[in-house]
A protein has these predicted regions:
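Short N-terminal secondary-structure initiator segments
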Residues: 22-28, 44-58, 123-128, 264-280
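Short non-domain terminal segments
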Residues: 10, 93, 326-327
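N-terminal targeting leaders characterized by basic, low-complexity, disordered sequences
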Residues: 1-3
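Signal peptide-directed extracytoplasmic domains
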Residues: 33, 37-208
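A generic short-segment signal for beta-strand/edge and adjacent turn/coil regions
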Residues: 15-20, 61-62, 87-90, 152-158, ...
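N-terminal type II signal-anchor transmembrane helix
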Residues: 5-44
């Protein structure tokens, strides 16, 4: 009996070892699979490649690897087989190192560049008025088409249902433009000038969803609503000239909110009176009562909604914030920001800039 017990124990140990080896093997395979499927980098700069007639999957894999768009040629060829991609059309294609294998293969399946294709670049910090102008300039749509879609109740309900980050907050009647802040600024390609406003919006919302998915946990754990967070990100974007300042800018506004201070943001005053940032901001603009203005005699504690389209850096600064002791910042005429901890320090900094001829005056 004792012998049999020892044999059973030995067999059990062997089984455990085999199971452990199997699990390690599976984990290694999964890790390898995920690694080679993932993007090469976060670089969104597009690279154009031309696939010639008669190119094989091996030729395409070699070209993609050479341009730094995939991690491994053999894995790419294997993955293409798994996806059952048979024919790739000879054409010009656009890829970026930030695309994963699925996105690259989807692009190949779509058939590449066509001569009627249009490209529109929406820069970080652009507002809805700027987007409407660009859509008018580059497509068959008018600015009025854009504004009508922003008021289209049926479309807004559809968008709220489809995208987890859109809520009924965007339907507040005091908001100037319902999707302000939610259309991710980037370069987008469309088949031709007849693209609809809805198609443009959906593509931009799809990209915003990808960006915000990275911060879903932080958003869920925040004391602020997603609408408030996007609003803060838009203010951070509009206040900053240099992306390196975004983290400190966001921390200033978080610190002010914690202590009950007014946000006191000039960019909300501009937006509230529908002025561009290049316009002169008058005292009457600062004192104007509107649902966005956080300065003046009767400031709102929080703008009713976003004031621009925040990019990736501004979103990161707001959704993954740092802690500082800063409560103030001021810009010189060269767009350099100076951060300070107290009102006294802030006022001294302004005096210093004035004395040095660096103070920005209209």
């Amino acid at each position: 009996m004792e012998k049999q017990g020892r044999k059973l124990k030995k067999k059990f140990k062997i089984i455990l070892v085999l199971v452990a080896i199997l699990l390690i093997g599976i984990a290694t395979l999964l890790g390898t699979y995920c690694y080679f499927k993932s993007p090469v980098s976060n670089d969104k700069k597009e690279v154009s490649i031309v696939i010639e007639n008669g190119s094989t999957i091996s030729d395409i894999a070699a070209l993609l690897k050479k341009e730094g768009l995939i991690k491994d040629e053999n894995f790419f060829k294997l993955y293409v087989k798994l996806k059952k991609v048979s024919n790739v059309y000879a054409a010009k294609y656009y890829f970026s190192p930030s695309m994963n294998l699925d996105e690259i293969i989807n692009t190949l399946n779509e058939g590449g560049y066509n001569e009627n294709e249009i490209s529109i670049t929406f820069k970080e910090g652009i507002n809805m008025r700027g987007i409407a102008k660009l859509i008018k300039e580059n497509t068959s749509n008018s600015e009025d088409d854009v504004y009508k879609k922003l008021k289209d109740e049926k479309y807004l309900n559809y968008a709220i249902e489809k995208y987890w980050f859109l809520t009924d907050d965007i339907k507040n009647s005091k908001i100037y433009y319902s999707l302000e802040g939610y259309l991710f600024p980037d370069t987008y390609r469309f088949n031709n000038k007849d693209v609809t406003v809805e198609e443009i919006f959906n593509k931009m919302l799809d990209q915003m969803e990808k960006e915000l998915n990275k911060y879903k946990k932080q958003i869920e754990n925040s004391k602020y609503s997603v609408h408030e967070l996007i609003t803060l990100a838009s203010i951070t974007q509009s206040e900053g000239y240099n992306e390196d300042d975004f983290k400190n800018i966001a921390s200033v506004f978080y610190n002010r909110l914690k202590t009950g201070m007014a946000l006191g943001s000039c960019v909300t005053s501009y937006y509230g009176v529908k002025k561009d940032m290049t316009d002169e901001l008058l005292q009457k603009d600062i004192d104007a009562s509107n649902p966005y203005n956080t300065r003046g005699n009767n400031p709102v504690s929080f703008p009713v909604g976003p004031i621009s389209m925040p990019g990736a850096k501004a979103l990161d600064a707001t959704l993954d914030p740092i802690e500082t002791s800063y409560y103030f910042f001021v810009s010189d005429k060269n767009n350099k920001l100076y951060f300070t901890k107290t009102l006294n320090e802030h006022e001294r900094m302004i005096t210093k800039l004035q004395n040095e001829g660096l103070w920005l005056e209209w």
